[in-house]
């Protein structure tokens, strides 16, 4: 057994997969719930605008997919011992943990932003139609925050060091 590949290294990889999925889905759930409340409130007064105003809910849901992508890639990259010898280095485990944290936490931040903007934006655009384009632009920038985390996570999952 080498200091480069301790038996605890896979724990960090699996934690990376878990935090990517958990935090990204927390953000997606918050964004969906918060903007869904806005859509529901607006739909009482103007039901014809409900389908047009569903964009924040969909954008928040996509954040959960980002976390799922990183979690699956990390989960497939974690290697168990072969013939009693570890095959997964601590460098790789820490890289996978960093990938999960980058994707998960940026997904959570994006979900919070999408929820707040979606709730207020949907209600405001029901009152003043000109605000719809501005709301969509702000939502796109908020979604980009989650996308940045996905990109960094994908780069970090490709980093690995051999055990030899």
UniProtKB/Swiss-Prot annotation:
One Gene Ontology term of the molecular function aspect: proton-transporting ATPase activity, rotational mechanism
Subcellular location: Vacuole membrane
Disulfide bridge partners, by residue number: none
Coiled-coil regions, chain positions: none
Keywords associated with the record: Hydrogen ion transport, Ion transport, Membrane, Transmembrane, Transmembrane helix, Transport, Vacuole
Pfam family, one: ATP-synt_C
Site residues, Essential for proton translocation: 143
InterPro entries per record: ATPase_proteolipid_c-like_dom, ATPase_proteolipid_csu, ATPase_proteolipid_su_C_euk, F/V-ATP_Csub_sf
Residue intervals passing through the bilayer: 11-31, 54-74, 97-118, 131-155
PANTHER family: V-TYPE PROTON ATPASE PROTEOLIPID SUBUNIT
Self-association and partners: V-ATPase is a heteromultimeric enzyme composed of a peripheral catalytic V1 complex (main components: subunits A, B, C, D, E, and F) attached to an integral membrane V0 proton pore complex (main component: the proteolipid protein; which is present as a hexamer that forms the proton-conducting pore).
Similarity comment text for this entry: Belongs to the V-ATPase proteolipid subunit family.
The protein's name: V-type proton ATPase 16 kDa proteolipid subunit
Gene name, Swiss-Prot/TrEMBL: VAP
């Amino acid at each position: 057994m080498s200091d480069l590949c301790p038996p605890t290294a896979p724990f960090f990889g699996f934690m990376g997969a878990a935090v990517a999925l958990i935090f990204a889905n927390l953000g997606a759930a918050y964004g969906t719930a918060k903007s869904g409340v806005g859509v529901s409130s607006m739909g009482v007064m103007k039901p014809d605008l409900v389908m047009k105003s569903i964009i924040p809910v969909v954008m928040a849901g996509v954040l959960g997919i980002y976390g799922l992508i990183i979690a699956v890639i990390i989960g497939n990259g974690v290697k168990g011992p072969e013939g009693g010898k570890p095959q997964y280095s601590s460098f790789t485990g820490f890289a996978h943990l960093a990938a999960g944290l980058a994707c998960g936490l940026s997904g959570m931040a994006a979900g919070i932003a999408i929820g707040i903007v979606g709730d207020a934006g949907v209600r405001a655009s029901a009152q003043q139609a000109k605000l719809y384009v501005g709301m969509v632009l702000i939502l796109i920038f908020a979604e980009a925050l989650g996308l940045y985390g996905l990109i960094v996570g994908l780069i970090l999952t490709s980093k690995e060091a051999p055990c030899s």
